């Protein structure tokens, strides 16, 4: 599943980063978005972008465009 499709309150475990742009890939890796990390959607801005997520005991705001490059499996 593409992580840009997650709804508020849903959790997913990152399985793959599909990013050809090394700069964006490095940026996400530097922020802790790595394979195996658990992500929870905390809130979504009124216009749908950006998305506030929680991972590794901190929160980040990511654009939907960046989240669309991250694959994961939903955790129930």
Q: Which role does the model predict for each range below?
A:
Residues 1-2:
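Absolute protein N-terminus
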Residues 45-76:
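C-terminal structural segments of small proteins and small subunits
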Residues 23-27:
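Short alpha-helix capping/helix-loop boundary micro-motifs
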Residues 15-16, 30-32, 52-55:
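Short, acidic/hydrophobic/Gly-rich beta-strand patch recurrent on exposed beta strands
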């Amino acid at each position: 599943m593409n992580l840009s499709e997650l709804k508020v309150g849903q959790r997913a475990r990152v399985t793959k980063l599909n990013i050809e742009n090394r700069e964006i890939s490095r940026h996400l890796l530097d922020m802790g978005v790595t394979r195996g990390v658990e992500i929870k959607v905390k809130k979504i801005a009124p216009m749908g972008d950006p998305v506030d997520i929680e991972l590794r005991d901190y929160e980040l705001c990511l654009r939907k465009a960046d989240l669309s490059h991250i694959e994961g499996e939903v955790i129930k």
